[in-house]
Amino acid sequence: MSDRPHTPLLDQVTRPADLKRFSDAQLTQLAGELRAETVSAVSVTGGHLGAGLGVVELTVALHAVFDTPRDKVIWDVGHQCYPHKILTERRDRIRTLRMKDGLSGFTKRSESPYDPFGAAHSSTSISAALGFAVARDLGGVTPEGLGDAIAVIGDGSMSAGMAFEAMNNAGHLKKRLIVILNDNEMSIAPPVGALSNYLSRLYAEEPFQELKAAAKGAVSLLPEPFREGAKRAKEMLKGMAVGGTLFEELGFSYIGPIDGHDMGQLLPVLRTVKARATGPILLHVLTKKGKGYAPAERARDRGHATAKFDVVTGEQKKAPSNAPSYTAVFGKALVDQAARDDKIVAVTAAMPDGTGLNLFAERYPSRCFDVGIAEQHGVTFSAALAAGGLKPFCAMYSTFLQRGYDQVVHDVAIQRLPVRFAIDRAGLVGADGATHAGSFDIAYLANLPGMVVMAAADEAELVHMVATAAAHDDGPIAFRYPRGEGVGVEMPELGKVLEIGKGRMIQKGARVALLSFGTRLTEVQKAAEALAARGITPTIADARFAKPLDRDLILNLAHDHEALITIEEGAVGGFGSHVAQLLADEGVFDHGLKFRSMVLPDIFIDQSSPADMYAVAGMNAPQIEAKVLDVLGIGRIGEKRA
């Protein structure tokens, strides 16, 4: 007996075109079946549940009305795309979401023609849709053709400047472009800022029940340029016209808000937009994150991303923890430092829970700032906090900090302002794949004059690095740490301030030195144990700092060993490259040192478990062991010693 839901209509759907033969009542039933199938699939795989459940009706309506893949539906962020994937010839693989060799948890061009533009970071959809619209009008060609361009963007994503840059440009170009504002009053955390308040007022100004009834006759509601006599409709629904002023000033015709879970509203409005739209139009749709699944509705923030769970109870099936997560360790360590220094403040970009700053916000709400999905603003805001005499910790994922890189250079580094960058999700992150990998921050930060760059080898080291950053006032400082649990080391009661630019010796050996930067140290130690069985005892050191380098440690390792190997969870151009530059400048290579640098390969690694991803990268213990044997000219693993 199968525990999968009963889905008689969904079973008849192999591609979106099949939806066009269903009646509106059947499409409503189909939405219910699609919601049940989404819950069932995510219970097996884990993933982003709440966002997808909130757009089930919208997904069905879009594919029923428009002609995908000729019409380009572009999902902002892409984490809400699971129902879309089920309808677009991928239902048979939906229970491989976020797994090795499975479906991506986001939209991905290489996966399906129904994913015209990949995503995983926010606020890109309007720019992409505008690009497709211009390409269409200038005779561009794609295998599926070019029809309408539809961006579906959440209210949280609208807090990013990029979305408004795109809307401003679209209003100027006046191309036929459809933007659907999916307003669920929530991104990952509750939304913040003036725009959120504006949307809330817009919703409140028009009694929603009256709006629901009126929207049934959507053709008569549409503002200019869609219908003669629209002036009367605007008078009838004054809140719609007045409420949309912000978007209309940007050059968009505005419709809404309408109920995003009522097919009786969605279908006629979308059909009329498709039939009559000329220039850019914004359709404001109200939805509920987690809609239709009680556990997700009750805890919408936690419903954003879940582990595998029991469908009946919603209880997540998490393996017991052996050590605290790095994120939790950072959050607690920062709270401890803030208790001793009232100048410490914290900044995050819509990720208080993901970065561990929820702990800080609970204790010190007036000293914690969630700037929304606005990394550029967040970095410059932090810079000015530092210029004003405070001690800001700017906590962001490595992959998202990329969005604020110009601000890191221009507003922080050049002015030598003591912003403390807490860089979470460093290295390879697992199920979220290449879009969320923290591969590049070592390279893009360590090349900046005056920037201090640290990496924690374990959770205790992270506590010390938080303390070090808190004490550092001579310019910017960054420390990176991975997703997931620590390694189970004994934790200090309070962090100690590390000497800037000084590493530590872990184990003394001979012939080969392994210099680790970050949490690959654990794999290095495992490799050393395997090498010991072969009679090889490598020296092991933890660099702690990529900038400034511990010159004495590195030069001594080079002088005392036949070979030196660096290991880091980052791309080429990072720690190993800086070590190589030092060795070259000091003429060490002139005297025969064998040097190797183990870095992430020059590819984007698809989702899998972190261990599998590091195996692909060639950076697990067996591969480190093999590198040592190779550089020493000893037989490969598996070959017997002579």
UniProtKB/Swiss-Prot annotation:
One of its GO terms (biological process) is 1-deoxy-D-xylulose 5-phosphate biosynthetic process. Keywords: Isoprene biosynthesis, Magnesium, Metal-binding, Thiamine biosynthesis, Thiamine pyrophosphate, Transferase. It is an enzyme of class 2 (transferase). Thiamine diphosphate binds at H79, A120, H121, S122, G156, S157, N184, Y293, E375. Binds 1 Mg(2+) ion per subunit. Pathway: Metabolic intermediate biosynthesis; 1-deoxy-D-xylulose 5-phosphate biosynthesis; 1-deoxy-D-xylulose 5-phosphate from D-glyceraldehyde 3-phosphate and pyruvate: step 1/1. The keyword Magnesium applies. SUPFAM superfamilies: Thiamin diphosphate-binding fold (THDP-binding) (SSF52518), TK C-terminal domain-like (SSF52922). One of its GO terms (molecular function) is thiamine pyrophosphate binding. Belongs to the transketolase family. DXPS subfamily. PANTHER family: 1-D-DEOXYXYLULOSE 5-PHOSPHATE SYNTHASE-RELATED (PTHR43322), 1-DEOXY-D-XYLULOSE-5-PHOSPHATE SYNTHASE, CHLOROPLASTIC (PTHR43322:SF5). Catalyzes the acyloin condensation reaction between C atoms 2 and 3 of pyruvate and glyceraldehyde 3-phosphate to yield 1-deoxy-D-xylulose-5-phosphate (DXP). This is 1-deoxy-D-xylulose-5-phosphate synthase.
